[in-house]
């Protein structure tokens, strides 16, 4: 017991020295977490030996020491990866490398220089909440640390990694808890941003200049902007929409980057008739065998995770699949899950197998194989 007490005293003495030093060096904070880890190992062992006190020190239950030890291991190993990155020489405070800060939204990221954002629900100053907008956020993507800036808009607080936008505070979700009218205003940096009556999560329609089919378009910003992806609500739409007047536009799903414009109703109706005939003929041929359908992989998971994963697929593995849909959801379903879906299509089953053999699908995303009984291409 005396040996255990000496080791514990030495460990706690080193912790006190680190606290007093209040260093800005990352190596010192790594040393701090090593000491915390060692301290909890000693306390865990003391409890196993049946000790309730070591001198004046109360020995906590096994579960407490085990949990704190695991936290210390996690922080030590994570900070060691930061030290090896280009940000290892930056000044870091003890608070910025604390476990509490590690779990502060956005979770499992390091944050610096927080600023307060006030959100007034129902546009009432007495019904307001305060959130922290971080000037710098350190995100680990594919085992590589990236330093990005925190940003705010009417929808929430977010950061961008490449072209992938991640919201860590969603004002619409918060409004469902704190607001009666689902309206709010954001007060930040001497500016006030008012919300619409309802915030739509879909991408705005594409605006067309002129009646021709290849006019210049202006695209609204999407949560994850990938040039070959369709808008969020277009996946389950039929090949053409029936329009009610001239100079309207319909999207053509066969190629998501193209726009089809109809200058009169007759032109579009005739195209619909031809397309429907081809669709029925294709269905009759495909019903004979599943293998004649288009091979697909259907990904299911959190909407934002799917968008980020889809962005990486286009960036690194676009040769291993043919098309990727936007994120979509089943409607009129008794299933209350909020998981989104992304559908990938392939030239043949061999390309799909090559994709599965090469690409590591995250554990948070479920995938199923299948065939489409209608022609998308």
From Swiss-Prot:
SUPFAM superfamilies: E2 regulatory, transactivation domain, Viral DNA-binding domain. Residues 1-200 are annotated as: Transactivation domain. It comes from Pygmy chimpanzee papillomavirus type 1. It holds the Pfam family PPV_E2_C. One of its GO terms (cellular component) is host cell nucleus. The keyword Transcription regulation applies. Plays a role in the initiation of viral DNA replication. A dimer of E2 interacts with a dimer of E1 in order to improve specificity of E1 DNA binding activity. Once the complex recognizes and binds DNA at specific sites, the E2 dimer is removed from DNA. E2 also regulates viral transcription through binding to the E2RE response element (5'-ACCNNNNNNGGT-3') present in multiple copies in the regulatory regions of the viral genome. Activates or represses transcription depending on E2RE's position with regards to proximal promoter elements including the TATA-box. Phosphorylated. GO terms for biological process: DNA replication; DNA-templated transcription; regulation of DNA replication; viral DNA genome replication. Residues 293-377 are annotated as: DNA-binding domain. This is Regulatory protein E2. Residues 270-297 are annotated as: Disordered. InterPro entries: E2/EBNA1_C_sf, Nucleotide-bd_a/b_plait_sf, Papillomavirus_E2_C, PPV_E2_N, Reg_prot_E2, Regulatory_protein_E2_N, Regulatory_protein_E2_N_1, Regulatory_protein_E2_N_2. One of its GO terms (molecular function) is DNA-binding transcription factor activity. It comes from the Viruses. The keyword Flavoprotein does not apply.
